[in-house]
Amino acid sequence: LSKADRLQRAAANLPVEKRLRTIEEMGRIWRRRWESGELDGVAERLAQSTGYSPEVIRLEMSFVAEVLDPEKMMKNLESTLRGGAASLEGMVPISDGENIRNHPCGPALVISSGNSLVPPFIPTITALATGNLTILKPSLSNYEAVLAVISTLEEAVKTTGAQEMLDLLVVSYFSHRSEVLDHLLTNARIGVVNYWGGDPGRGEVSAKVAMNPHMPRYFVNGPLTGFAVIDENSADEEAARGLAMNILLYDQQLCSSPTQAAFIGSMEAAKRFCAMVGSELDALGKGMAMGMSDDGAFILQCSRKYVQFAGGRVFSSNDTDNMWTITLSESVSDLDEASQSYGPLAFHNRRRFLEVIRVDDNERVIDLIGDLPDNNAYRGADKVQTIGLAVSAARKEALMPSLPSTGAYRIVPLEDMFMRSPLEPYDGMDMAKLFTYGVYQRDTSLGKEVLD
């Protein structure tokens, strides 16, 4: 940290094109290692440590190259930074006689989530591309895989000559009670802290950051969830398959994963659609074995019974490698009542578990999305991040004026809930802005006109 200013000044003189070329080379190296089988052992151990199926981990390992896509990063920088990517290199005109330059506000400390590999690199690559000295704290479960990605940077700079980027990155594992981590949060000269996760961790980190005399920025990517909206006219096999795939990916641990859905139409049509989704979960889930202990299977069966006692209809599978569950209720969430009676039914304990609520109109859909944080069955999720739509054009037009007011951050096609565009904010925030600050420069005087 004592060298942070010098290192960030050196990186500030590195052309953005060279920074992105280095990131591109990282992606090329990763892709080569992955396709050659060099990373098979890392993938196997990551599956064991995270509990995800080998098939899901293999998919995630292939996603790493997407995070290292220079064209996507350039689009993100151009669309989010005032003055565009060029403002990271020098002053850029924004009006006659007025200029702006975006500087890194680091050193940056990224405390990442531990349930997969890709999330740690979303803020880390952005922080590096914007010139921040970056300290990345992965979790014990993904530490080895994170180091495997970082090793591509070590090789990439030999080709691009961008040693400054390698000098900016530090990867360290700290326990939650680490004295070093405590020092970083409470006393170190840190410019920004990015925490991924929920309570109690984020509250503890927030309290410590508030004590830091250097007043670092603090922003959180908290636990969120997905909500699907389907109407009777769009309840076809394509919608069922898209919904099933988003349920299976990462066993609903993504912030975009659908955990609740509203079906607008008759109860009979809702039953048919739930059965269709179940068939797709059977077919697709066979290739993504989840695995479940006897204790876990017993708890899940009890959970299903409690939902039935609360009045819900249950569609389910008893295949221990693919134990999916769909509940269907009328107008209100039966899971709300059931989860109050049965603790193990809590939000973070559910995997491949979707609650479908049949409703009559658009207004009820809006209410369900906005009320989800107050539903006992979803305690642990701050709110809805992603709304996935499979509705008619007319219904979409009717819904769109109200959907943004629900607090959700993303409204996308149902089958595409897990995919991100480089142009979209991350949980409502432009991440490149969070790792930079704007320096404004003006050549002309404005005060004379006011004082005269």
Which residues does each predicted region cover?
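N-terminal Rossmann-like NAD(P)+-binding subdomain of aldehyde/semialdehyde dehydrogenases
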Residues: 1-100, 384
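Short internal beta-strands
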Residues: 135-141, 262, 388-390
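Short active-site oxyanion
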Residues: 190-193, 352-354, 383-386
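Structural signal for terminal/edge beta-strands and the immediately following C-terminal loop/tail
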Residues: 425-452
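NAD(P)-dependent aldehyde/semialdehyde dehydrogenase
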Residues: 241, 250-258, 262-381, 397, ...
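Structural motif
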Residues: 195-199, 231-233, 264-266, 329-330, ...
